[in-house]
From Swiss-Prot:
Organism lineage: Eukaryota, Metazoa, Chordata, Craniata, Vertebrata
Gene Ontology CC annotation, any one: cytoplasm
Similarity field: Belongs to the isochorismatase family.
Protein name: Isochorismatase domain-containing protein 1
Disulfide-bonded cysteines: none
Coiled-coil positions: none
């Protein structure tokens, strides 16, 4: 005798147009526990949930079964295998389970390969931890400060928002005086290495057209790297300014930039960024940007360590 299919549930959609909460999986199983096959990626694990469980319970069950394999920074859709259609179908948050079934958690795709185009209206600058106490330890610190100031001036000229963080300023001091923070959107203290703080996420949410972040500061292999990975995990395109980014160790810097480039992050220079943002010599701000970049960026030795 053939085994009964894992999921023979029918989906009751008679009142979908009126309310998502009307959707349920209809069956005759009245026990307190319903067997469910939880599928994620190439894996499938049988388990059970209480009768009448909905979206939140299922998400927690996926997390308990698959743990660190699920990147909660991404967006997902929960799908039910419908025997009627012979395939998975999307379910809204209001559905409840009352019969054994097979469900899966599907991550929505994030495009990691990008063309790297920049426009002032879709870009934010992130200045990371350019603080006085780091001056003696960071290689070519004076040079990256000079380039950082060029970027901040360019942001003011082009009307690009700037977010600045300071790592534990109580102990490490504030941003160096050479950097003019006039007009920046936020200056935030932090203890977390990544710049992607709740306040930063809220600020980005207020700028719905933003799709790119230009990132510079210290240290390349710590705060810059973790910020870049957090941003790209949220679907934001990241441009790291190589001539405005450094570490205490050039080996750490080199391997961090190599890793980030492999993950779809764009490694670029300050001049390339500024000219890409104006894009045309007829841009009304081109002359100001041209004057800004006439003084060449320092030949600091960072190039040989990229």
């Amino acid at each position: 005798m053939a085994e009964k299919p894992v999921c023979t549930a029918q989906v009751n959609v008679s009142c979908v147009s009126q309310s998502n909460s009307c959707i349920s999986i209809v069956g005759s199983n009245n026990s307190n526990s319903v067997p469910v096959l939880f599928c994620f990626s190439v894996f499938a694990r049988p388990s059970s949930v209480p009768h009448g469980s909905g979206y939140e319970v299922l998400i927690q069950k996926f997390l308990s079964l698959y743990g660190d394999q699920i990147d909660m920074h991404r967006k997902f859709v929960v799908q039910l295998f419908a025997e009627e259609w012979g395939q998975y179908i999307d379910l809204p948050k209001g559905f409840i389970i009352s019969e054994r079934c097979k469900i899966r958690l599907v991550p929505l795709q994030i495009q990691l390969t990008t063309l790297g185009n920049l426009t002032p209206a879709s870009t934010v600058f992130f200045c990371c931890d350019m603080q006085e106490r780091f001056r003696p330890a960071i290689k070519y610190f004076g040079d990256i400060i000079s380039v950082g100031q060029r970027l901040l001036q360019g942001a003011r000229i082009l009307g690009i928002p700037v977010i600045v963080t300071e790592q534990y300023p109580k102990g490490l001091g504030g941003t160096v005086q050479e950097l003019d923070l006039t007009g920046v959107k936020l200056v935030l203290p932090k203890t977390k290495f990544s710049m992607v703080l709740p306040e930063v996420e809220a600020a980005l949410a207020e700028l719905p057209g933003v799709r790119s972040v230009v990132l510079f500061g210290v240290e390349t292999h710590v705060c810059i790297q973790q910020t870049a990975l957090d941003l790209i995990g949220r679907g934001v395109e990241v441009h790291i300014v190589a001539d405005a980014t450094s570490s205490r160790s050039m080996m750490d810097r080199m391997f961090a930039l190599e890793r980030l480039a492999r993950n779809g992050i764009i490694i670029t220079t300050s001049e390339a960024i500024l000219l890409q943002l104006v894009a045309d010599k007829d841009h009304p701000k081109f002359k100001e940007i041209q004057n800004l970049i006439k003084a060449s960026a320092p030949e600091s030795g960072l190039l040989s360590k990229v």
